[in-house]
């Protein structure tokens, strides 16, 4: 049997603090379990990551303000601008990685809710192999996965590459 756990079938943004099945979403693209009883949902057109508490069915905003900008690094993820949240993954330490397609970047939200740029930035490019991830550039990343060894793998789509 199939049933809806989040979203009411209409386009928009609403419902924080209420039942997830009554919430609106614009374009959910990916989801990941957070290891704390939640399902994180990347909504690329809403510029947010939402969190569904699986036990209570309540939805809240985990990251993003709805503004289509790349802002807020070093601050709370809930107060940061997210630029095209295409995909997410959660590592074994509880850190959440956000793949920002339009922002050409990977950002991390640590267990205390602080967001940090990990790789890329607003400018498109293909550089940085062999160096620190923070100095690398990306071009339209579309997917991200965290492996059991703590690596973050990125589908760097427009560069026709998988990067780690």
State where each predicted segment sits.
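A short loop-to-beta-strand structural motif that recurs across blades of beta-propeller domains
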Residues: 1, 47-51, 58, 104-108, ...
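Short loop/turn segments immediately following the C-termini of beta-strands
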Residues: 44, 101, 157-158
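Beta-strand-rich domains and repeat architectures in extracellular enzymes and scaffolds
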Residues: 27-30, 41
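Phosphodiester-processing cores and adjacent nucleic acid-binding clamps
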Residues: 31, 51, 152
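Gly/Pro-rich loop segments of beta-rich domains
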Residues: 1-27, 56-84, 113-140
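Residue-level detector of Asp-centered blade-edge/turn motifs that repeat once per structural unit
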Residues: 33-36, 90-93, 146-149
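Conserved beta-propeller blade signature
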Residues: 38-41, 95-98, 151-154
